[in-house]
């Protein structure tokens, strides 16, 4: 329940712009969110492996 309330709180516009932070649009995770996709690293990897993100491929070197 605490996580849901924090997600709802993050959606509101903060009083000061500095207080705004990124959250994963799928799971609500705060840390390691990629701005380009708007999702966290865990969801990014899961979606990339399933082929749901166009243009993303596994790196090999």
Swiss-Prot record:
HAMAP family: Ribosomal_uS14_2_B. Belongs to the universal ribosomal protein uS14 family. Zinc-binding uS14 subfamily. GO terms for cellular component: cytoplasm; small ribosomal subunit. GO terms for biological process: translation. Pfam families: Ribosomal_S14. Zn(2+) binds at residues 24, 27, 40, 43. PROSITE patterns: RIBOSOMAL_S14 (PS00527). Binds 16S rRNA, required for the assembly of 30S particles and may also be responsible for determining the conformation of the 16S rRNA at the A site. NCBIfam families: PRK08061.1. This is Small ribosomal subunit protein uS14. InterPro entries: Ribosomal_uS14, Ribosomal_uS14_bact, Ribosomal_uS14_CS, Ribosomal_uS14_sf. One of its GO terms (molecular function) is zinc ion binding. Part of the 30S ribosomal subunit. Contacts proteins S3 and S10. Keywords: Metal-binding, Ribonucleoprotein, Ribosomal protein, RNA-binding, rRNA-binding, Zinc. Binds 1 zinc ion per subunit. Its cofactor is Zn(2+).
